[in-house]
Amino acid sequence: MEKLQPARLEFVAYDTPYSAAFDDVYHSALGGPAQARHVFLAGNELPARWQDKYRFVILETGFGTGLNFLATWQAWRDDPQRCRRLHFISFEKHPFTLADLATCQQAWPEFAELAAELQQKWPPLVPGMHRLHLNDGQVILTLTFGDAATQLRSIDASVDAFFLDGFSPPKNPELWSPHFCKGLARLTAPGATLATWSVAGHVRQALKDAEFDVAKRPGYIGKRQMLVGRFRSRRPDRHVAPTDRRAIVIGAGIAGSSTAHALAAAGWQVTVLEQATAPATGASSNLAGMLRPLPSADDNRLSRITRAGFLATRALLAALPEARWSPCGVLHLAREPEHEGQQRRAVEQLGFPPEVLQFVESDEASRLLGQPVTIGGWWFPNGGWVQPPSVCRAALAAFPERITTHFNAAVARIVRQNDQWQALDANGNLLAEAPVLVMASGAAAPRFEQFAWLPQRSGRGQVSHLPASVGKPLNTVLFQIGYTIPAIDDTQLIGASLSYEDDESAEREADHRDNLARLRLTLPDFASDLDPATLHGRVGFRPMSPDRMPIVGAVPDTMTATPNTRLHNIPRQPGLWCVQGFGARGIVWSALMADLLVSQLEGEPLPLERDLVDALDPGRFLIKAARNSGGELPSDEETSEPAA
């Protein structure tokens, strides 16, 4: 994995920001905002083309200082006929640090309010996609930090307008190549347009070869000409937005509540059906759970998804002031010296900013924790603990005009009648009806006929509650063999046990004893006199997928596939979706998976790279079965993470 190198901010004549890496300026010295409006907005016939539409999607090839985005956002805000949702996708190989971004944007006082909101939500400089919900969720900025030439193929979107604004072709040839232009053409919506300041002959030819009709237009001050274009193919739009935005969500745990919140934020009317008397009574009822990503030296799929999920959860928590959580940090100690070396090397290889991930030696780990430890490990300064029930309640209450909850509503079966999904109780009474149904009932999902195929196992987990007076108070969440969460409401949490083929709902003293034993391996003197027979806690059942990845997407309409079947060729049951298989990572995954599912439902740009979306698709298990590549559930340290 190539480390992300931040841009180095420099200025040349007229205080114009300049890139030493590409030996080029970020925008015209003769008026950046005016250039953005002339070339990219007017060149794409905006704002006229987005007027009276539900959504409009723009893709930009270089985010740079954010000037084009701010100019577009401002034009959208000023237009009373604007589209309801504006998506803006942009790439940046060398993003600015927050401080440098703010310095650049000080030059445009007309964008001060918008720039402040953007800066408030500016993501840490780590590779991958970053989804920012701005302007009360009506403007969605999807930033991809990395090389656009290689990242373009990971985008799944239907683009209405392209802003071709890389550095000059001689300095940045990859973003003007025939191959790149054909990649842009793959993403076009019907009637898609483009605009760029470059009129180089080979750029025009590359765009023509990619089926764009191009023409020269008068350029901005100091540049005689610019280029505009329109995609000439009439292929149908693959991403059609639904017209009837009503959905049923079964389950009010953290998966279902987050999904209902995301649907409502996108304008859907949502009915949540929960068999219990309140939200978050199953695996999401823990007093608290851990929030942190899971890095790997090779930045594998699990690492990338948990990192994206961690950032999405942080963003959701910021939008839900009633949700209870603490960014106290998470200390993930190594198991033994060899593992300590692996952790240290992973931090060096990843090169993430210190606010995301650090390696700390044992003395610094002891200082952070407030307890002596004998080994170092990973430190996540922005991690912490989250109280899942408070998140569920806050999410369900955020849109009272769009979310209707029904508790004590036990769904016995679901059927599809007249293009509507119906949720029925045991007596056949109709509980709810809608064209879309999302299954988010965790371990209970396989009892429904349409989900009997679901290859998830129920993992029984037990956490133990310790009085806050036991041991010296911890400053951070601690994880090693097991985990410990600092005192919340006079209670510390330790855990968690894990067993399969085990439906015992009562607490077991043996599991409390095991939880204490894991804690004492890390902190030998902590709670050394505590009798496990005196402890209480809670038991939950986690839905675990075979590959430990979530199961999110449209539900297959067939239970068979061939080894050569492609995911997108598997037929799907109309209107039937699932967000399942979160296992012990419900806190870190729920917000991101909800965003992904809503984006798929709406036909909007996806918040994850295509390979990660495929790794979550429910249809993957059919293909794996056909290839005889299914595997046993792995056994690793992560099995003792808290359920949420």
Swiss-Prot record:
InterPro entries in the cross-refs: FAD-dep_OxRdtase, FAD/NAD-bd_sf, MnmC-like_methylTransf, SAM-dependent_MTases_sf, tRNA_MAMT_biosynth_bifunc_MnmC, tRNA_MNMC2, tRNA_S-uridine_synth_MnmC_C
Cofactor(s) this protein cannot do without: FAD
Assigned EC number: 2.1.1.61, 1.5.-.-
Biological process (GO), any one: tRNA wobble uridine modification
Domain of life (superkingdom): Bacteria
Name of the protein described by the UniProt record: tRNA 5-methylaminomethyl-2-thiouridine biosynthesis bifunctional protein MnmC
Chief location bin: cytoplasm
Provenance organism: Dechloromonas aromatica (strain RCB)
Catalytic activity: 5-aminomethyl-2-thiouridine(34) in tRNA + S-adenosyl-L-methionine = 5-methylaminomethyl-2-thiouridine(34) in tRNA + S-adenosyl-L-homocysteine + H(+)
Cellular component GO terms, alphabetical: cytoplasm
Spans annotated as FAD-dependent cmnm(5)s(2)U34 oxidoreductase: 250-644
UniProt-annotated stretches for the region tRNA (mnm(5)s(2)U34)-methyltransferase: 1-232
Listed GO MF terms: flavin adenine dinucleotide binding; oxidoreductase activity, acting on the CH-NH group of donors; tRNA (5-methylaminomethyl-2-thiouridylate)(34)-methyltransferase activity
Family as reported in the entry's similarity comment: In the N-terminal section; belongs to the methyltransferase superfamily. tRNA (mnm(5)s(2)U34)-methyltransferase family.
Annotated localization: Cytoplasm
Cited HAMAP family: MnmC
Gene: mnmC
UniProt entry keywords in alphabetical sequence: Cytoplasm, FAD, Flavoprotein, Methyltransferase, Multifunctional enzyme, Oxidoreductase, S-adenosyl-L-methionine, Transferase, tRNA processing
One matching Pfam family: Methyltransf_30
Keyword Transmembrane: no
NCBIfam families, alphabetized: MnmC_Cterm, PRK01747.1-2, PRK01747.1-4, tRNA_MNMC2
Function as written in the Swiss-Prot or TrEMBL entry: Catalyzes the last two steps in the biosynthesis of 5-methylaminomethyl-2-thiouridine (mnm(5)s(2)U) at the wobble position (U34) in tRNA. Catalyzes the FAD-dependent demodification of cmnm(5)s(2)U34 to nm(5)s(2)U34, followed by the transfer of a methyl group from S-adenosyl-L-methionine to nm(5)s(2)U34, to form mnm(5)s(2)U34.
